[in-house]
Amino acid sequence: MYKTKAVFNLKLKQKFVFIFILFVFLSLQGYSQRGGFKWSSDGNSYYRIENNSVMQYTLPENSAKVLISKEQLTPKNSSSPLDVRYLISSNDEQKVLIFTNTKRVWRLNTKGDYWVLDIAKGSLTQLGTSLPESSLMFAKFSPDGKAVAYVSDNNIYVEDLNTSDIKALTSDGSTTLINGTFDWAYEEEFACRDGFRWSPDSKSIAYWQIDASDIGKFYLINNTDAIYSEVVPIEYPKVGETPSACKVGVVSIADAKTTWMNIPGDSRQHYLVRMEYI
């Protein structure tokens, strides 16, 4: 009886651990969505967005405190706080990137507006104000915390956080030449969305460029956004057709010059789905 009970308790504990790990995995996969959470850099606490504020829960007691209040998330000349989709902290956790006013791209809301909250100064500043509304994608702090890079309309930009100066690192982006993100095929088949990486020294950015100019178009009908339908063309390679060309380059923050990597193989027949600094 006791042996059976012990085995049952062990299996129950194992099941609990499995469920907890699965919960953590799914939460981390989707922490960008409201209701998820994000671990602190030291692993001793985690953050959640609750009631328009950011809460910090410290382990093991799971004690809670307001890390960022809704007043801190309220822009000047506004009576309501930002509708936060997700948060990204700088390496020193003194600044926070806030993603809001989002729009769907294919399956996920990856376009939107980004704001930077400087916790020490208490300042809340919108990024990319000279670019179209809700057009910024995949904003990331530089490792030194002095700048933020993001994609808008298939070009990559870097914004100095001290001066708010915005520099275009690429300028050839179009609906078929895609810098810093991916086309439908890469997202659908490989879950590739975020298409650039900061270098550890904050002096350059490595990025993907997708050339879909020779891909045949698949036409969709948009019947929902207006009283008249609209034809929406999508570059969509059918089975047996040649897919998009892909290459990886490294662009200098100082002069915006790109050095293309010499990668063996056919750029249209060989997929490049992962790339990181090591």
Where are these regions (language model features)?
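N-terminal secretory signal peptides that target proteins for export/translocation
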Residues: 1-14
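Bacterial N-terminal signal peptides
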Residues: 17-27
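Beta-propeller folds
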Residues: 30-278
